[in-house]
Amino acid sequence: MLKHPATKYRPFPPIALPDRTWPSKTLTRAPIWMSTDLRDGNQALFEPMNAERKMRMFKMLVQIGFKEIEAAFPAASQTDYDFVRELIEGGHIPDDVTIEVLTQAREDLIRRTMESLRGARRAIIHVYNATSPVFRRTVFNTDREGVKRIAVESAKLIREIAESMPETQWTYQYSPEVFSGTELDFALEVCNAVTEAWDPTPAHKIIFNLPATVEMATPNVYADQIEWMHRHLARRDSILLSVHPHNDRGTAVAAAELAVMAGADRVEGCLFGNGERTGNVDLVTLALNLYSQGIDPGLDFSHVNDVARTCEDCTQLPVHPRHPYVGDLVFTAFSGSHQDAIKKGFAVQKPDAIWEMPYLPIDPADVGRTYDSIIRVNSQSGKGGVAYLLESGYGIAMPRRLQVEFSSTVQQLTDASGREATAADIWALFQETYLRADGPIGYVSHRLAERDDGSQHIRLVVNIADREHVCEGVGNGPLDALVQALAAVLAAPVSIHHYEERALGQGANADAIAFAELAAPGVAGSVFGVGIDANLTTASIRAVVGGVNRLAARHAQAQPGQSLLRRGMAPSMELA
C-alpha cells in the first residue's frame, strides 16, 4: 500500500444538494423487486448455470414471490436464447410474472433479443450503454453526443420492433451504465432524450435503471444522486426509477435502502449478493431488513435454508456462515454473556408478543430456522449457553449455582479439546460428572416410613468398598432423615444448602430430577449432586448421595491421605 494514497486516488466529489430530503425519510413499504440472478448473477459464475439449473432457479424465484425476473442475455449465447424460448413456449411464466432480458445498444443484438421474446404475454427489454467520462474516453472513444445518440436510436428501434409484435405488452428499461460515475447533468440529458424517444405514459411507464455499476462512494452520495435525478427527470409520473447497486465498497445494502428513501421505486439485485466482482446488492438481506421493521417485503423467505441450499447447488458458490439472516452462524451465540441474555430473553418472550430478544433481530422460526443452534459452546462460552443446551435438548433445567459450577467443567473440556462442545458432548459430560454410579458411596436401596410423631425414618443401604452398610436416621423430613443416616458413615457432618426437584417431561410416567447443594466442614465451598429416577424420593436420595461423593472427592484433593468417610470405611478410590 502507498504511504500517501492521495498521490494515486482521489475522493469522490460530493453532490450539491443542500436541501436533500432523504435523511428525514423512513422506509414504509417494499420497492418493486427485480431478480437478476439468472443474468447478472449467472454471468459472474466460474461455471454458468446450465438449462436445468437455470430452470430450478427460475421456479424458486417465482415461488419466493418475484414478479420481475431478468432471465437472460439472449444475444450473448445460444444457451440463453434457448432458455428464454423454453420459458415462453413451455408455459413456465405465471400470469403475474414478467421476464426481463438484457441487450447492448447494437441493432443486430437488439433484433435477436426481441425475437427471443416472441409470444411472451409481457416482457421488459433492457438496454444499456456506458455514459461515464472514463468509458466515453477510454473504452468507446466518443463524446457526450455520441453516447446520447446510441441511447436514443436504440429506444426508437425497439419501439419500432415492439409495434410489429403487438401480442406482447412491452416495457422499456434503459440503464446509463456506470451511472454512479456519470455527471448528473449528462445522465439527466440522456434519460430525458430516451423518454422523448419512447414516449411513456403514466399507464405504461418506462424504467430508468440507475446503476452503481461500480460502487465509488459512501451510500449517502448514491442517495443524493438518486434524489437529484428523482427531482429533475422530465415526465416523472411516467417513469419507474430503479437502482442496481454493486457492493465494491461493501455498502450495497445501505445504498439501496437510502436510494429508496431518496425516491427509487424499484431495486435490482441477486439472492445472497451474487454478481460481478463483489456482487450485486443482496435481495435477501434487503427483504428481511424490511421484515424486521414490521414491513411486508412481498417476498417469502419462510424456508430460507432451502433457498440457500438451492442457490449453492445452482451457482456452486457457498453462502457465508456469517451471511445476514441466512448463514449457519448468524443465529448462534458462543459468548457467555450473549448466551445468558438470550436464555433470559426466551424465558420471558410471549408467543404472540412483539419480538424483543437480546442479540436476535428476528425470530429464527419466521425464516424456517430452528432454535437448536442458537446456543453453541466453546472456550469463550459461559453458563447461559451450557444451561440452554441442556434444557432445550434434554429437559435439564439446572439451578443457577449449578449452572455456574458445571460451566467451569465444560470450560475445562473445551480448553483441553480446542473445539466446540456439542449438546451431546455436554450431556455426556453432565452424566459423567453428576449421574455416574461409581464413587465412594453407592446407593443400593432405601425404605422410608413416617413415625407417630410425624417425623420420618429411613433405612438406607449403601455400598462402600464392595461392602453393604445399613444406615438409619430420623428427621423432620426425608432429606433430614437421610443426612442423619449418612452420618453413620461420614467423618464430618454434611448439610444441604439448597434443594430443588422437578419432573423431566410431562405426564404421569415422567422421571423426576432432584438437585441437592451440599457442604461439609473442611471442604471449600459447596457442590451439587443430581439424581434422576422414576420415583421422586429415590431421585432426591441419589442426588444427596451423589453430592456426598463429590464432596468426598474435593476433600481428598484438598487434604491428601484423609477421607470424608469414617475410618475403616474409606475406599482407596477417589472421585475425579
UniProtKB/Swiss-Prot annotation:
Positions with a binding annotation for Mg(2+): 40, 244, 246, 280
Region described as Regulatory domain: spans on this chain: 437-576
Localization of this protein: Cytoplasm
GO process terms (BP): L-leucine biosynthetic process
Keywords assigned: Amino-acid biosynthesis, Branched-chain amino acid biosynthesis, Cytoplasm, Leucine biosynthesis, Magnesium, Metal-binding, Plasmid, Transferase
Enzyme class at the top of the EC tree: transferase
GO terms under cellular component: cytoplasm
Protein name: 2-isopropylmalate synthase
Gene3D superfamilies in alphabetical order: 3.30.160.270, Aldolase class I (3.20.20.70)
Family listed: Belongs to the alpha-IPM synthase/homocitrate synthase family. LeuA type 2 subfamily.
Species in which this protein is naturally found: Ralstonia nicotianae (strain ATCC BAA-1114 / GMI1000)
Entry EC no(s): 2.3.3.13
Record text on subunit structure and interactions: Homodimer.
NCBIfam families, per database record: leuA_yeast, PRK03739.1
GO molecular function: 2-isopropylmalate synthase activity; acetyl-CoA C-acetyltransferase activity; magnesium ion binding
Regions crossing the membrane: none
Span of domain Pyruvate carboxyltransferase: 31-305
Pfam family, one: HMGL-like
PANTHER family, A to Z: 2-ISOPROPYLMALATE SYNTHASE, PTHR46911
Principal subcellular localization: cytoplasm
InterPro entries on file: 2-isopropylmalate_synth_dimer, AIPM/Hcit_synth_CS, Aldolase_TIM, IPM_Synthase, LeuA-like_post-cat, LeuA_allosteric_dom_sf, LeuA_N_DRE-TIM, PYR_CT
Function: Catalyzes the condensation of the acetyl group of acetyl-CoA with 3-methyl-2-oxobutanoate (2-ketoisovalerate) to form 3-carboxy-3-hydroxy-4-methylpentanoate (2-isopropylmalate).
Cofactor: Mg(2+)
Pathway where this protein functions: Amino-acid biosynthesis; L-leucine biosynthesis; L-leucine from 3-methyl-2-oxobutanoate: step 1/4
Catalytic activity: 3-methyl-2-oxobutanoate + acetyl-CoA + H2O = (2S)-2-isopropylmalate + CoA + H(+)
